[in-house]
Amino acid sequence: MGSEMCIRDRYFIAAKLLREAGEGPSIIVSPLLALMRNQVEAAARAGIRAATINSANMTQWEEIQADVDKLDLLLISPERLNAPGFREEVLPQLARSVGMLVVDEAHCISDWGHDFRPDYRRISLLIDDLPANTPVLATTATANDRVVADVVAQLGEGTGVLRGGLDRESLSLNVVRLADPTQRAAWIAQYLAQVEGSGIIYCLTVAACLLYTSDAAD
């Protein structure tokens, strides 16, 4: 989480600086709706104008597309990016003026990756349509050597690779043994009251998700 936030903050800053230099909005390709919402909220807190186009806000697409020149960042799912209507009607205008292209969760490009998304493979077609010297950044925290090589091959010749270490002081793994769902819900509620920021709670069932969501809201 800490590493991801550092990367995100850097391309937020880069997008803002590019806009101030007269470039167009930056495009971030992201595979997860929750992640896109989180990034839009984080951008707003940083004073950066951002919006997202995905399957959860279809009624807002036309409004967002009409006002795209007013944005610093546009977050979009790979499936929407490759939809015929979007590619033919919206993408050409964006490609002509895009400040930067960011491919988030770039391991999804590789069919060797654990979370392969076919539409990510088509991002290379978008890169071919971008003006020369348009910055392209691909980020991931889960790529082995084979996946990195595949991503580089998809992005094109001249792609540079920067890799950080795997020992991250900001991450820890703990196991807490609790007897039943009631105790787990109580522990989560107590823990949430002690920490700041955002996070994700993974559950095995929809019922558990609803239970913990209700407790967290209270």
Per-range role (PLM):
Residues 8, 16-19, 37-51, 60-78, ...:
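Helicase motor core with emphasis on the C-terminal RecA-like subdomain
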Residues 29-33, 53-57, 166:
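A short hydrophobic beta-strand->loop->alpha-helix junction that borders the nucleotide-binding pocket
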Residues 1-7, 215-218:
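Short, small-residue-biased leader/transition segments that mark boundaries at the very start
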Residues 23:
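Acidic/His- and Gly-rich active-site-bordering loop/insert found
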